[in-house]
Curated annotation (Swiss-Prot):
Name under which the protein is recorded: Histidinol-phosphate aminotransferase 1
Cofactor(s) this protein requires: pyridoxal 5'-phosphate
Family: Belongs to the class-II pyridoxal-phosphate-dependent aminotransferase family. Histidinol-phosphate aminotransferase subfamily.
Domain of life where this protein originates: Bacteria
Gene of this entry: hisC1
The keyword Glycosyltransferase appears for this protein: no
Associated pathway: Amino-acid biosynthesis; L-histidine biosynthesis; L-histidine from 5-phospho-alpha-D-ribose 1-diphosphate: step 7/9
Subunit structure: Homodimer.
Length: 370
């Protein structure tokens, strides 16, 4: 028995190494994971409180329509409840959209590098993938527009982008939306939306009324600190969302996930404190990069992508041996970079000292051979 031919060309998603795996592999007792862009400050205390009240519901199926969460999220965003589609993390939302819209003979347009699951699910559905290289680390919307044709079903824009942390400016997005054919669905993946503080970062939800071919994705995994519970959602026009509901698995978001998302949503003070501390953490890395002349992309997320002057895999391995897990840029096709999640202040301080050692060693090598 053989699976789809498309599956034979793909590899299963490989996440960042987990803590227990690294402990076993390197014989370490203390590990700091800065690889998967998780919230180092955890989640709201209200989440813990919500969990204690759920024991009596474990034997029951969840609300398949997520009515209470749907209502609260809609109110929070200022949209209609019918505009929301919930999934088990944005991974499932991306899968649902791809399954519903793509097939052989269609194509998708996206940046490179960007979040890998856009490409992954397009290939599974038999669609052509048209990738456009980033320009100075940012989506090149002009070049992406040139790749769009009558068979383009989806244009993916990860904003802010993973793995670079960069963003598309408001005016450039508006120009793109005015130019792109209405037959192509433009999806703004805003998984890191809560961290984006740039003045010209586009606020996309108000644009949904004007652009029916626009959709916005958001998640509770990042700034809200609920990655373990797997819950994200799409916001779009009611007709399309209603059609996509057909592709959604029954009971796809658990009672636990819905309950903790509600609790997290109600604690905006905790969220804002996390965002504030994250910004302070980013500036720790900026100061290091400027002092040591290390290339980096200014970030609108909770991670930073930088280049130390050595292969990303080498930096990854050497940091891991010291107990720090990051992501090698090689995983994204950028062999000379690494992506580091912003951690607690002391974690940032500690890994920055290790980064300084790597940079100094490289400088000494270059001086030796010069």
């Amino acid at each position: 028995m053989r699976v789809k031919e498309q599956l034979l060309t793909l590899r299963a998603y490989v996440p960042g190494k987990n803590i227990e795996e690294v402990k076993r592999e390197y014989g370490l007792s203390k590990i700091v994971k800065l690889a998967s862009n998780e919230n180092p400050f955890g989640c709201s205390a209200r989440v813990t409180e919500a969990l204690t009240s759920l024991a009596s519901q474990y034997a029951l199926y969840p609300d398949g329509h997520a009515f209470e969460l749907r209502t609260k999220v809609a109110k929070h965003l200022g949209v209609k409840a019918e505009q929301l589609l919930f999934g088990s993390g944005l991974d499932e939302v991306i899968q649902m959209i791809s399954r519903a819209l793509l097939h052989e003979g269609t194509n998708v347009v996206m940046a490179n590098p960007t979040f890998s699951q856009y490409h992954h699910h397009a290939v599974i559905e038999g669609a052509e993938v048209r990738e456009v290289s980033l320009k100075d680390g940012i989506h090149d919307l002009d070049a992406m527009l040139q790749q769009v044709d009558d068979q383009t079903k989806i244009v993916w824009i990860c904003n802010p982008n993973n793995p670079t942390g960069t963003y598309v400016e408001k005016q450039k997005l508006l120009s793109f939306l005015e130019s792109v054919p209405k037959s192509a669905l433009v999806i703004m993946d805003e998984a890191y939306y809560e961290y984006a503080g740039a003045e010209d970062y586009p606020q996309t939800l108000p644009l949904l009324e004007k652009y029916e071919n626009l959709m916005v994705l958001r998640t509770f995994s990042k700034a809200y600190g609920l990655a373990a519970f797997r819950i994200g959602y799409a916001v779009g026009n009611t007709e399309l969302i209603g059609q996509l509901e057909v592709a959604r698995l029954p009971f796809n978001t658990s009672t636990v996930a819905q309950s903790v998302a509600l609790a997290a949503l109600e604690d905006q003070a905790f969220l804002q404190e996390c965002v504030k501390k994250n910004e302070e953490g980013l500036h720790q890395y900026y100061a290091f990069c400027k002092e040591y002349n290390v290339f980096y992309y200014p970030s609108q997320t909770n991670f930073i992508f930088l280049k130390l002057g050595i292969p990303g895999n080498e930096a990854f391995e050497r940091l891991m041996k010291k107990g720090y897990i990051v992501r090698s840029g090689a995983a994204f096709g950028i062999d000379d970079g690494i992506r580091i999640t912003v951690g607690l202040k002391e974690e940032n301080d500690e890994i920055i000292e290790l980064l300084k050692e790597l940079v100094n060693e490289q400088v000494q090598k270059e001086e030796t051979y010069s």
